[in-house]
Amino acid sequence: IGYLFTAKSGTGKSTHTNLWREFFKERAVMVNDDKPLLRVTENGVTAYGTPWNGKHRLSTNIGVPLNAICVLERSDENHIEKVTAESVYNMLVQQVYRPQNPQKLLKTLQLIDVMADNVNFYRLGCNMDISAAETAYNGMKGSI
């Protein structure tokens, strides 16, 4: 089961995923630390590792079913809530590749809509304590 974390640049995505690796040890596998490839079908979403794996060079050549997308926000206390796709739509559009060609951009937006029907969405307020990883996991695992 895969979880994808997204946020504005500098929010702490790499820091948070590092907490997952610290908390879960070898059970936490990084598919891609920067730009995973998402295959979106009517049957679900699969996340794949790619060579574009960011400054930390963390990527695994695998594909995993994507269960949830979690929007990270900084907070003094750790908390997570399930949210609607509509509430995070703007963030999703900002984070995907947006073609200049209008027809291709429309297709991208349609894929986001299909993805929204097949993936759970969460908003995580977190600090840099290892308990943030546990909070995120416990909040999202119930939606499997």
Language-model segments: residues:
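Post-Walker A alpha-helix
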Residues: 16-17
